[in-house]
Amino acid sequence: MISTDPWAGAVQDIIAAGRRMDRFGWVPATAGNISRRLPDGRIAITRSGGHKGHLTADGVIEVTADGRAVRAGDRPSAETLLHCHVYEASPDVGAVLHGHSVASTVLSMMEQGDAILLSGYEVLKVFEGQQTHDTTVRLPVFDNDQDIARLSGVVAPYLGRMPAGYVIRGHGVYVWGGTMDVALARLEGLEFLLACELERRKVAR
């Protein structure tokens, strides 16, 4: 049953997204984060350390717009700030997803430049503003950094120019959308494209 309570609805969305991402192998072990913006501007986000394929309501916590836990004792993921910056940059964004797939991890390690270029694929049209396969979408690659505040500062200036999201080298992707369904569709599209690109590079070797 779909809940009319904003918090309960957000929790349901996050749990369902975690199960879907786990089915595809995008959130191994306790990797990944899932969040949804609440009507009051706060954020529902997965608790640090939980397996996203086995989430319960207790695995979702509430944080402020700048990433501080609302309830004493709750421990947000260290990467919560990266979600917060996406919401801050884009008022229309309602959900943010972070996954650790094999394709995104390997391709970002192979890529020597600052972006993975995706060209000629029909599925590029899953991204906002893309009307044709005959185009190139740039997926920015940022070097990994355990200092999340510093990494957030590097990523933030580019957030308005990322139709496909971005990838952290050797780490994983960040994708978002106006709703959880849109964010999941974009993540699925991006992961398909990255898997195709990885296969192409294997064949070309």
UniProtKB/Swiss-Prot annotation:
The keyword Zinc applies. GO terms for biological process: L-methionine salvage from methylthioadenosine; pentose catabolic process. SUPFAM superfamilies: AraD/HMP-PK domain-like. Its cofactor is Zn(2+). It is an enzyme of class 4 (lyase). Catalyzes the dehydration of methylthioribulose-1-phosphate (MTRu-1-P) into 2,3-diketo-5-methylthiopentyl-1-phosphate (DK-MTP-1-P). This is Methylthioribulose-1-phosphate dehydratase. It comes from Gluconacetobacter diazotrophicus (strain ATCC 49037 / DSM 5601 / CCUG 37298 / CIP 103539 / LMG 7603 / PAl5). The lineage of its organism: Bacteria, Pseudomonadati, Pseudomonadota, Alphaproteobacteria, Acetobacterales. The gene is mtnB.
